[in-house]
């Protein structure tokens, strides 16, 4: 058994749920642990795991093939001339009041900054859809769309100004594209991005999300500091490294 993305930890089984439990359980049975970073490797070592290989993250490999310089889309045409913000919010632990706080913070920004447009590829969960409809209504500078295919999603990220998310993978994808990320969670299994300065944990309180969102729109120095920070997730050769390690082990 090979575990790709091994060693990501929050050590809180409720956040993210159920991913944190699944990751810890998989590491117990894995014969090969492919850790994306040194921090992930150290987590595994503390747990007594062996056969650990730091390879970087395979999502960086994917970005090399999905992101296109000449990519276009009607929604991107709609957003031209504006600061395009990508919003992703779906975590089950954020359903209810935390997600309402997120949406209200975004709404306040839309009311205050006329040059901002937001695209929200919305989760299929009817509770998420109901809340989004209630908070955002028919705002002309908010596009709530169906989930995007990975090629489209990566290119939307690439052409955005910044990202607000409670997702996991976006925390690796966006920094690789030079995009600041506000993580609307209280914990993250990707502390490397926070340490590097590409991610900022802003929690789920409306005022804190709003304040940090506004700062990146108004303070160019702060924006550039986050967008130009180093990418800690590898050089895009993770897949090749993993294959070579497995082939060597089977020889």
Where are these regions (language model features)?
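Nucleotide-activated sugar donor-binding and catalytic core shared by glycosyltransferases
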Residues: 1-120, 126-251
């Amino acid at each position: 058994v090979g575990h790709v993305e091994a060693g990501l930890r929050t050590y809180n089984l409720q956040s993210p749920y159920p991913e944190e439990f699944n990751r810890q359980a998989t590491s117990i049975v894995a014969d090969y642990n492919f850790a994306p970073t040194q921090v992930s490797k150290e987590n595994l070592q503390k747990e007594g795991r062996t056969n650990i290989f730091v390879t970087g993250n395979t999502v960086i490999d994917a970005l090399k093939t999905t992101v296109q310089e000449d990519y276009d889309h009607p929604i991107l045409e709609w957003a031209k001339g504006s600061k395009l913000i990508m919003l992703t919010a779906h975590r089950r632990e954020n359903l209810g009041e935390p997600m309402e706080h997120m949406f209200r913070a975004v709404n306040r920004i839309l009311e205050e900054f006329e040059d901002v447009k937001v695209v929200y590829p919305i989760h299929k969960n009817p509770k998420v859809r109901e809340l989004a409809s209630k908070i955002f209504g028919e705002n002309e500078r908010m596009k709530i769309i169906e989930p995007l295919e990975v090629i489209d999603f990566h290119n939307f990220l690439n052409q955005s100004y910044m990202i607000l998310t409670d997702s996991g993978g976006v925390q690796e994808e966006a920094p690789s594209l030079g995009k600041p990320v506000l993580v609307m969670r209280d914990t993250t299994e990707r502390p490397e991005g926070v340490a590097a300065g590409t991610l900022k944990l802003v929690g789920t309180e409306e005022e804190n999300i709003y304040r940090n969102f506004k700062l990146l729109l108004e303070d160019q120095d702060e924006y550039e500091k986050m967008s130009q920070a180093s990418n800690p997730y590898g050089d895009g050769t993770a897949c090749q490294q993993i294959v070579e390690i497995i082939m060597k082990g089977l020889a």
